[in-house]
């Protein structure tokens, strides 16, 4: 049974809940359009290096953490979609 890939938006949602801050307020603090965070939270947008750097500063995590989440998500999706087609 294939595992469900974890999008960076799921982790961001957890971090927002833990810190008690809204996506809109965080967007203002890290100086990005709120829609960017809303789209990441909805799994409709990928994590970018710019956003990863800004989130890392706010949450005290490395930017690599956020980028690795994105990379792992994309690889998991590719594995599921391509299955055994690539040998």
Language-model region placement:
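Short, contiguous, well-ordered secondary-structure segments
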Residues: 15, 38-41
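Short alpha-helical DNA-recognition segment
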Residues: 21-39
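A short, Lys/Arg-rich alpha-helix, primarily the initiator
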Residues: 1-21, 68
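Short, charged recognition helix plus adjacent turn
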Residues: 65-87
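The alpha-helix within a helix-turn-helix
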Residues: 16, 27, 56
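The DNA-recognition helices of helix-turn-helix-type DNA-binding domains
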Residues: 33, 44, 59, 70-73
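Short, basic-rich loop-to-helix N-cap that marks the start of a DNA-contacting helix
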Residues: 44-57
């Amino acid at each position: 049974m294939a595992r469900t890939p974890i999008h960076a938006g799921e982790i961001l949602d957890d971090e927002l809940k833990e810190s008690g801050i809204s996506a809109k307020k965080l967007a203002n603090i890290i100086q990005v359009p709120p829609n960017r965070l809303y789209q990441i939270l909805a799994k409709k947008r990928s994590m970018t290096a710019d956003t990863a750097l800004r989130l890392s500063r706010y949450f005290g995590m490395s930017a690599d953490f956020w980028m690795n989440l994105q990379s792992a998500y994309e690889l998991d999706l590719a594995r599921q979609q391509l299955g055994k087609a690539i040998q």
